[in-house]
Structure formats: structure tokens, C-alpha cells
Amino acid sequence: ASEMYADGFSKFRFGGYGEMAASYMDYDWNWVTPQGTSHMNRATVSIPRFILAFDYKFSPKWVLSSEIEFEYGGTGAAREVEWYEENGEYETEIEKGGEVALEQFHISYLMNKHLNFRFGHMIVPVGLTNAHHEPLNFFGVYRPEGETTLLPSTWHETGVALFGDLGNFDYELQVVSGLDPQGFRMENWVGKGTQGAFEETQFTHPAFVARVNYNGVKKFKGLRVGASFYYNQPSKNSSKPLRNQGEKYPLTIVTADAQYKSPNN
């Protein structure tokens, strides 16, 4: 909340950021298969994301915020080579080669620094990377692989939120759309479980989210310690409801993290 009050713009502002990445690998992309090899020199370049942001103040208390994300150049037909099944034949798949997504679109009512309200499409602050997903907030070229494999990233859902500051604590409480169990996989847990395959999002069983940060460690100015909590009953949000009819499997996520930024920067 303190960040929103300190933003300083009077009416509207534009912003954004982007990432360009280059990687070098000394192994084949399919090195774990019999056809692959663990010894191959190759390099890649990509534009993982480009974000455009816009904020508008209807009044000092009502603020509209939006972000549009372009991933890997936007949407298009992805082409793949069927190396084994079809002897290298090229196919045009009905897949998205990249993505254009409305990452944020919400209205905030700034009542005071302690209690504020938000309505719309917003970031789900579960885990360090989702809560602080801008490129300057992680050390590597890419976002931390462990967290972005197990959890959606960037995770954004539609709902309502309360947020504010209480002394050295800042908090956010959300009720947002839940996950689709059809996206759960053994190899990436709930990382692919966000809804979005259809125009409408199921809200039968919403998710409950809480995040708290503490910034009052006196011996280490610049240290922030945080924790987040997520609870959802995703069976009613299934994109294949007959398959999950009558099933109940609650999903609970608890995370803890810390981040240090030098006060001299």
C-alpha cells in the first residue's frame, strides 16, 4: 500500500519492461532419450516477455491499473518437427507459439495506508517469484526454475483483494478464481493449472490467498521476510467436470521467503 501512495503520478502514466535472453548449452535438447546426446554445443536467443503497463487515477482514491504481456513475440501457429514418429515431417499445430495475456486489469480504492480494496484481474502473490516477478528482482537470466515449474508464473487471477500496511508489516488478502485440476501433472505439480482455455472462468470454488511481508529487521535494513498461503478446492473448477464429478481434493500451498536489497542502492 505504501508503494501505491508514494507513486507520485497525478493523473496517468505509461510504463513497461522487457527481457531478452541468450543461452548456451553443451547438451542436446533431448539428451535423456536414446536418440539424444549429452555432448552438443548449441545456443538460443529469445524474448521471454514484453510488458506494457498503464495506470489512470480517476481521483486520488480510485486507480485503474492494467498490464498486457507479450510472451515470445505473441501468438501464432507453432511449428514442430516430429523427429521419430513421422521421419522429420513438418507440421503446423493448432498451438500458441507465445502468448498475449491480460496480466493485470483492476481498480483499487485507496482508503488509507492500512486498508485498501482491489477488484479485477490481479497477480496472485504466492511465492517469491510471483510476488516480485520483475526482472530486477531475481539474479539469473531466467526466473527461478524450481518455483516456476511447480507454480504458475506469472500467476494472475480474477477476484477481490484487501491490502495495506500495519507498522512494519504489509499484507494482501485475496478471493480469486481457482485452479483447473485438468492442468495438474506429476512433472510440474500445479504449474499448468490456471484456467483460461475458455472465455469464461469457473468461480464455483474460489481460492483464498494471503501474503504477509515483514520489513522491520533492524540489524539488516533492506531485508524483507515474507510468507504466503493458498487454499482451493479445484474439483468444481474442472474443464472436464464429468471426469471429476464427486471428487474432493483440497489444495493447500504454504511458502516462506526472504529478500535482501542493499539500502545503499
Placement of each model-derived feature along the sequence:
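Outer membrane beta-barrel
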Residues: 3-25, 40-181, 204-209, 213-220, ...
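Loop-centered beta-sheet repeat module
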Residues: 189-238
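Solvent-exposed loop segments that connect transmembrane elements
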Residues: 30-40, 76-96, 180-199, 235-249
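Active-site glycine- and acidic-residue-rich loops that bind
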Residues: 153, 199-207, 245-253
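Accessible peptide chain termini
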Residues: 1-2, 265
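Glycine/serine-rich loop-strand microenvironments at binding/catalytic pocket rims
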Residues: 163-200, 224-226, 248-249, 255-260
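Detector for outer-membrane/organellar transmembrane beta-barrel domains
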Residues: 218-265
